[in-house]
Structure formats: C-alpha cells, structure tokens
Amino acid sequence: MGIETFALPGWTGELIPELRPADLAREVARVTDPAAALKTLHWGRNYLYVIRLETVAGPVDAVVKQFRHAGGKERVRRRLRGSKAEKSWRVAHALLDAGLLTPEPLLLLESESESGPAFYVCRQETGVLEARYLLRAANVGREREEFPGVDYPRFLEELGRMARRLHDAGFWHRDLSSGNVLLRCDADGAPAALYLIDLNRTRMGRRLTTNERLRDLSRMPLLRPEDRDRFLASYWGEREGGPVRKMVYLSYHHGFLWKNRSKQRLRGGTRTLRDLFLPRTAHAHIPEAPAEASARDRIVWDRLSD
C-alpha cells in the first residue's frame, strides 16, 4: 500500500493515493470540522465522528479521530514522540502488513501549530459488532438471547488466536480490551474477521515478554472462568499455558477490574464537584449563534439545549 505526503496551509499529512480526496483542500477542511460529521461516535478526551470522504474512487464513509494538544504535557509528548494520530497511522499500516486486521487507514492530518490538533482517519467498517456488547451480555449469561447470530465460544477461540498472532508479530497493544475489537460474523455465526482499533498506545517492533503478553490479555473483561479458560487455551495452546502463567494472568486481570471500578467511583465524585464549580459548555461542533439571531432563536444555540 503506497503512501503520499502532502502539505497545505496550516496542515501536513499523508494519504493513500488510490483513495486520494478529489479536492484535497476542501476535504481536509471538512475532515477537521466536526460540524461536517454525519454522526458523532464519542465526545470526550478525544473526538470521534463519521464523515463521508469524497475520493477519486468515489465517496467513502470514514471515522475521524481527533487528538488534541491543548495542554503542555500533550505538546511536549507530541514534540518528543510525534502525535497519537501519527502513531495510529504507523501502527495501522504495520498491522495490515503483518496480516492482521484494522479498519483501512485513509488519511493522517497534522496541524502545523504545536498546540493544534492531529487527525487519524480510517474507513468505517459496516456490519460489525463492538465486542464490548457481546462480552457484557456473556458476563451476565445473556449472550444467546441478545446475540443469537454469534457463535460465542468460537469467537473466544478466534479472539485468543488473534491475540497470539498480534503478539508473535511484535505488537504490544497495551489496551486490548473488548471496546477495541470489532467482530464480523459469517452467516452461521462464526467469526469471519476481528478488527483492532484504538492503536495509539501500541508498541511494536520487538519480541514481547511473557509479562507483557499477560498484561495485554488481562484487559479483556471475561468474568466467567470458563470463558477465560477457553480464551487462554486458544492463545497458549495445550502445552504453553500452565498454572504459573494462569496465576499471573488472574492477578493482572483482577487488578485491572479493580482499577476500572475505582476509576468509575472516582469519576462520579469528581463529576459532581466539576458540575458545581464549572459551567456547562456546548460541544465543539455546535457553532456560535448568528449575531442577527433573535432571543427566541438563540435558545437553539444555548449550551443547556445541547
């Protein structure tokens, strides 16, 4: 897969020549404007939204992930290591070269301003299921009722095999959780493809230690012992597992679950304090009210209406 670099006023970037935007400057302006989104996926520390990218090969629905660098820590990290968008771009291409799946990377955009945002754009996969919803159902014994079209045991086995291929290829994802795996099934419910997403923490290019492998595996929220056993057996095989590795895995796994529960409790408390002392603000994709708008019309733009 070839890569083409480009520069525009205020921006530099890379793209796939076969899917080059038909009007590069226009599409860059649209990609970087959340108001052009067809759908918002996540609005938090990072922004994720769907746009329709007009390319030389026709329109392509794409997911845009915006990484901000407003704080000093983020700017220093970007200067020393590059942006998280660039990291996602490099890892995505390396995964595909290694025969692993991730939504096709389409565009990398870097603001020339040190404090400006960076954007990673990839193809939107359709007909896929975010594994987090399947695992949530399984953890309460409802996977068959909620997802009758998915062969859950075969999914766990393929998930373990995919994780093994990932690690053997020298990738340490560092956030291998159910929210970062997309599943596509065959007509009979068997897993046809597993896509990895959220790649900006990934380290690559070296052999993983057993400890690093177990730390990655432990982040998958499998609460039923039989599900964990099936997953680990598919990862290690019959000969490589063993009680010591399982014990270390369980210590990491329970530690990860405890950490997540603690974070949720802490966030609940800090959110209450934040709401008391900081005013609510509108999402960034809602523009300012036009100067000529009447008082009645301005209600539409009021931050409390969002």
Roles of regions detected by a PLM:
Residues 3-23, 31-34:
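Cationic, histidine-enriched alpha-helical/coil surfaces that engage anionic ligands
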Residues 2-9, 258-297:
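Membrane-proximal basic amphipathic "stem/tether" segments
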